[in-house]
C-alpha cells in the first residue's frame, strides 16, 4: 500500500518534528495539492505529484543532499515509495515546473496581501547568480565567468537568471532561466550527458531558453510575470542590463505602467542637455562647471541630479554620484523623473534583497547543489528550492522571524535533536523486548549467565551500531 500526503504527515506527527508544523501546515495553508493540479501536474498512476514533491521539499530540512541519501538515512521510513519514483519525476521533461512556481507565488501573494495593495516601492528585481558544478559531464554545462572573482573567475556551471518580486515587505522568486556561456572544447562536449527531448515539451523550451542571451531572457521573464498578473511600480536591475533596447521594452509594457530604476554604465552613450549632446564624462564636467554638485548626508555621498533627453526613450533623470573612498563616478538612471536622489536610492537599495535571497537559497535550501547530469533534474531542483523559500518566507512573515537563517537553524536543530531522541527510544524499546522475552522463557534471569547469552551480545551490538551511526551522522 502506498502512502499519501496525509500519511507522511502522520509519520512526522508521530516523531514530533517541528518540520511538520512549518512545512506540512504551510502546505495545507497553500492548498499545495490543488496548486499542483492547477499547474497541470496530474499523474495517471502511482504516487501523486504533490506527494513526491512534498518529500523533495523536505530534503534541505532533513539535511539530505540527494535522493540516494534519503534511502541511506533514518528518514527512509517517512515514505514507502521507491527511489526510482523520485528520479523519474525529476528527469521528466513534461513537468510544467515554471507553471507550478507561478501557482505557488500567486498563492503566496494571496495569503500575505489579500487586499491586493500595490506598495509604492514594489518592484521586479532581475539578477543572476552562478550555480557552480564540479566536472563537465552534466548536460549543457559550460564555463561561466564570475565577474566578482575577476580574471580567475571562470568555472564550470550555469548562470541562473532569476526574477524576484518585492511586494513592499519581502521578496519572492517568480521565475528563472538557466543560461549557458562559453562552450566547452569539442572533446569535453562529446563526454557530456545528452538527452533527446520531445519537441515543444517544457524541457525542450527550457533548453531553448538556455541558449538566449541574458538581456533577452530578462525581458521574457518580466513579460511572462506581467501576463501572470504581477505588475509592480518599478523594475530594478544593475548596469549590465541597461541597454537602450532593454529600457525601451520595459517602458513599452502596459503603456509605461512600470518605471525603470537602474545602474547605468558611464560610457559612450549620449544625452541631450540644454541643447547639447554629451556623454557621461562630458556631462559631469558641464554640471561641475555650473556648480550643481550636491551632498547627501543620509548616504554620505556627493552627487549631481539632472533631467536629460535619452534618444529613443524620452526624458529620464540621471543621478551621478561618488561614494566615499571611490574614485570613479557611478551613474543611475530613472525613467520616473519625479524621484529625487534620496528616494531613488531608497528604491534602488531594494535590489539588495535579491542578493540576500540568493545567499539564503544557497546556504540553507541547496540551490545549485543538484548532483544529477540531467538538465530537467537541474530545473526541478531550482524550482523546489524556490518553492521551499516561499513556504519558509510565509511562515517567517506570519511568525515574525527576523532572518531565514534563524528560522532554518531552529528547524534543523529541533529536527536533529528529536530525531536522535526517537532513535534512542526505538533502541530502548527493542532492548526491553529482548529482556522481556528472556524473562518469559526462563522465568528469571541470572546476570552472569545472561552476559554470556546470545541475547546479551545482540543488545551490545545494537548499542554499538546505534552510537556509531550517531557519530558518523554528526560529522
Feature annotation, model-predicted:
Residues 1-47, 77-78, 180-182, 187, ...:
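A short, flexible helix-boundary coil/loop motif
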Residues 3, 91-183, 187-192, 302-305:
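Active-site-proximal, Lys/Arg-enriched surface segment
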Residues 50-64:
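Short, amphipathic alpha-helical "recognition" segments used to contact nucleic acids or chromatin
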Residues 63-65, 84-85, 148-232, 311, ...:
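Electropositive, glycine- and tryptophan-enriched low-complexity nucleic-acid-binding patches
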Residues 124-130, 340-372:
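Short amphipathic alpha-helical "interface-anchor" segments enriched in bulky aromatics
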